[in-house]
Amino acid sequence: LTGNLYHPGIRDLYGLQCWIATLIILGGIGFPILFNYGKLVNHKVRNLFYRLTGSSKRMPSHVRIVNTTTRIVITATLLLLVGGTLLFWLSENNNCLRGLPLRGKLAVSFFSAVTPRTAGFNTVDLTSLLPSTWFLTLLLMWIGASPLSTGGGIKTTTITIALKNIINTLRGKEKIEIFKRQLPSENVRRAHAIILLSILWIGTATCLVAFWVPEGSVTQILFEVTSAISTVGLSLDFTSQLNTAGKIIISLTMFVGRVGLITLLSGLIPRQSSQSYTYA
C-alpha cells in the first residue's frame, strides 16, 4: 500500500491495527518464550484433567517452565509497551493525535509503541511527529525485540541486564540478581559489549552517511541508521535521498544488524586460548 498503513483507506481501521500489533508482539517475544508458555498451558490443562479424573499424575509446575529469561522478556516487553504507549500519547496528543476519538488515540499510540521494535509499519506521518516522539521511536527501535525472535535491536534482555548492573553498581552490590536468580558475569559482559558495539556502529555509520549525503539532517540520518541496524524499516522520508555510497552503508548496517555484531566479530577474530597467570 502507498503510504504504508497510513493509507487513507485503512489508517482509521483501529481493530486491524490492534490485530497487527498483537502479531508483532508475538513475533517479537521470541519462539522459546512462546514455547514455554504453550508448554505451561498444556501442563495446566493436563493437571486439571488429572484432578477431575482422580489420577495421581502431575505435570511440572510453572516454576520449572517459566525461567528467568522468560520473566525478563515478558516484564521488559510489558514495560516498553505500556511506557511507549503513554509517552507517545502524551507527546502527540496535541499534534498528530488531535481530532481522533479516544479509541483512535489509544490504538494509534499503542501501535506506534509496538511497531518500532520490530515491524516498521506506521499509521501516522513520521515526518510530522515532534522531536520528542522521534527520540522515543528511535529508542524503541534501538532496543528492539527479544532473543530468538523475528525482530532486531540490542534485545530486551540486553538492556535489562545492563540497567540492572548499573543499579547494582550504584548500590555497591557485586552480584547481579534478577527475580532472585544470580546472573553469570559473562552475561553482564556480553550485554555491555553489545550495547557499546551498537553505539559505535551507529555513530560511525551516521558520520559516514552524513559525509556522503550532506543534504540530509542529522536527525534523518541517525533515524535511518538506527532503523537499519535494528532491521525495522521506518524512515523520515530520507531513503530516497541516499546516493550509492549511502545505500551501501545502510545495506551493510542492515546486514550487521541482522547477523549481530558479536556474532560477526566472533567469526572474524580468532579466539585466544585461555592462559593462567601468576602474580607476585
Model-derived segments and spans:
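Membrane-proximal intracellular helices of multi-pass ion channels
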Residues: L1-A280
